[in-house]
Amino acid sequence: MSFYSTEELQNIGFKLFGMNLLISRFSRIYNPKNIVLGNNIRIDDFCILSAGNEAFILEDNIHISAGVYLYGTGGIIIKSYSNISSGTKVFSVSDTFDGTCLVGPMVDEHLRKIVKSPIIIEKYVVIGANCVVLPGVRLEEGVAIGANSLVNKSCKEWGIYGGSPIKLLKERSKDLLSLL
C-alpha cells in the first residue's frame, strides 16, 4: 500500500491534521478544508472522505479499512480508538424514500426532501464489514456492530448490535479499557 507523505498531506489542504497518518494514495478526499484528522490514523485503499460544511473530525488511533465511504455533508465525528471495517458506508445525508418527493442529485432541490443529520461515533466503537449507517445515528462508547448490519438508529453504550435493521444482541465486555 502506498501512503501520502507529510508534505503531500499538507498540499491536500486539510483544516488540521496530526502525526503518524497513513492515508492511501488510492483514497479520495473531497472538501479537505473542512476535515480534521488527529494522530495515528490509517485510511486504506479505495476509501472516500466527503466533507460538507459541518464538522468532519477523526480523532486519534482510528482505522478506516478499505472501501469505506464517509459521506459527511451533515457532519461526521469519529472519536478515538474506533474502527470501521471494509465496505461500510456512513451517510450523514440522504434523500427521503417515502414517495412524497423525487430523489437524486440531478433533481431540482425544491422537488426533493433531504435528511441531513450528523453521525457521532464515540470512543472504542467497532463497525463490522459492509454495514450501512444512516443519518442522525449516534453510536455510544464501546458499541460493536456486526457485519452486514443496517444501522438505522442510535445504539446504547457497550452493546453488541447486528442485523438489518440492527437490534441489541448482548452486552460487550469493557475489558479492553484496562489495556490503555
PLM feature spans:
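Flexible glycine-rich beta->alpha loop in the catalytic core of nucleotide-sugar glycosyltransferases
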Residues: T88, D95-T96, R138, S149-L150, ...
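Short active-site oxyanion
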Residues: G67, E141, E157
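Short-chain dehydrogenase/reductase
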Residues: H63, V126, A144, L150, ...
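Extended, small-residue-rich solenoid/repeat segments and analogous flexible loops
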Residues: M1-V36, N40
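Short secondary-structure boundary/capping segments
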Residues: G13, M19, L111, S117-P118, ...
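Flexible, glycine/small-residue-enriched loop-and-beta-strand segment within the central core
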Residues: S27-L37, R42-P135, S164, K170-S173
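Beta-rich strand-turn-strand
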Residues: I120, N130-V143, S149-N152
